[in-house]
Amino acid sequence: MQPGTDEREWREDCAPRRVLEIFSTKWTSMILHTLHALHDGRARTGVLHRSLPGISKKMLVQTLREMERSGLIHRHVKGTVPPAVEYSLTSLGHRFVGLVDLVYDWGRQNSDALDLLQERPSSRRKSGD
């Protein structure tokens, strides 16, 4: 929201809601972080799939398509046989990685407190890990 904007008015298209919408998908931040931290901002689909344990190929492709529509990554199809598809961070994606890193750093610094939270049914983490 712009300075002076009434924060009681949370329109569907306001910036804070759009940012939280990006974070609300389970894999988006992990894919951004993985592209940036492990692959210097660009990687092929198979490399990303091997770098993200627990994600299905279908979910990876679905998330990559959504990230492309959001302007976070660019999809480049190389003219090889068979065609090779490579994904790279856009300038917006590079800027978003900074925010992802802040959240991940906070998680690392507060892991003890997070461990005390009640486990969510969708969490695969077991107590004692």
Task: Locate the predicted segments by residue.
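Amphipathic alpha-helical dimerization/coiled-coil segments
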Residues: 2, 13, 33, 98-129
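Canonical helix-turn-helix DNA-binding module
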Residues: 45-81
